[in-house]
Amino acid sequence: MKENEVKDEKSVDVLSFKQLESQKIVLPQDLFRSSFTWFCYEIYKSLAFRIWMLLWLPLSVWWKLSNNCIYPLIVSLLVLFLGPIFVLVICGLSRKRSLSKQLIQFCKEITENTPSSDPHDWEVVVANLNSYLYENKAWNTKNFFFNATDCEKMFRTTVLEPFSLKKDKAAKVKSFKDSVPYIEEALQVYATGFDKQWKLFITEKSWSPVGLEDVQLPKDIHRSKLTWFLKRIFTIYSLPLWLAFLNCICVSQHFCLAFRILCPGLFFLMMVWLFQNMRTTALLVKMEHKMQFLLTIINEQESGANGWDEIARKMNRYLFEKKAWKNEEFFFDGIDCEWFFSHFFYRLLSAKKSMWLLPLNVELWPYIKEAQLSRNEESLMKK
């Protein structure tokens, strides 16, 4: 009897394992070698690419019948070089258009599966939407979303940010029409899931600083902020830009004095702006880093300039340990840290439109307010 029971238990375990395997979600990221090969496949399957290929048929006939090859050559070069650009633009627009027509289904999937900002929570949404869009002929392949991150990004740019920026009900109805109640429900579910993730991050996943006594701020190491800045930008990664800058200086020598001063000057200012904002790729890409930054600000007991110095010191160590930055010199000092928070976080609360190349981080708005209030309250208590 016992042997039969053991056999039955083993058979049940095998069946359950097979059921789990059959229920395993297969995404395009599991089928393609990389996002680039997936992207090339989607372009190949698009209508715009086929039209571009068909354009070569009349061009080849024109080449054969024309006595003057100059005009066919010019048109062929235009089709060759401008054609791929138009194909990419049209594919991007058709992708947004296809999803905008299925916002209700998109929001229903989010409401049913309750994903948070964790990419793994979006895998079910990706699988369901890929199948739905293909079966309803809204997209010509089963690979609309490459992975969970791609789906979450589209949710932010298509639903979360545009809807959150609308100030009143009339503006929302005008832009989203019948999708408004579904979007509101989906956003409420998403906000609830993100709040749970925030609380879980505080209790289990947050980083605790250890051995900060030996951590020095760059202001204590370098003679000035200029030397720290120059050390950061004179790297192998910036070599192409510096070569372009030197080329700009050489070329401008053949022009008038005003142009020789203006051209290199503007180019150098552009480089300074670029390097000043290059840190955004380290801190603003991963949600985990942004949450840790806000949590560090909220939990800091020290007030005023000393408090921001401590926050800068902790974040310098954190980003170095997480390999998000190559050294412990991400922030120069507390003033630099406060500027970064004000420029890339607090300013989002009053944003009227999406910022260029930067996410609005709508789900972080309550915690950004909390971080700002915590610094203001500590400064008031000190007074």
Swiss-Prot record:
Q: Give the primary localization class.
A: membrane
Q: Which gene encodes it?
A: COS7
This protein's UniProt keywords: Membrane, Transmembrane, Transmembrane helix
- Residues assigned to the Extracellular compartment are 64-72, 254
Which ranges does the record mark as transmembrane? 43-63, 73-93, 233-253, 255-275
Look up and give the membrane topology term.
Answer: Multi-pass membrane protein
- GO CC field: endosome; fungal-type vacuole; membrane; mitochondrion
Is the keyword Endoplasmic reticulum assigned to this protein?
A: no
Q: Where in the cell is it found?
A: Membrane
Tell me the superkingdom of the source. Answer: Eukaryota
Q: Which residues form a coiled coil?
A: none
Q: What is this protein called?
A: Protein COS7
Picking any one GO biological process from the record gives: protein transport to vacuole involved in ubiquitin-dependent protein catabolic process via the multivesicular body sorting pathway
What GO molecular function annotations does the UniProt record carry, in alphabetical order?
cargo receptor activity
Record family assignment = Belongs to the DUP/COS family.
Provide Cytoplasmic-side residue ranges: 1-42, 94-232, 276-383
Pfam families per UniProt:
DUP
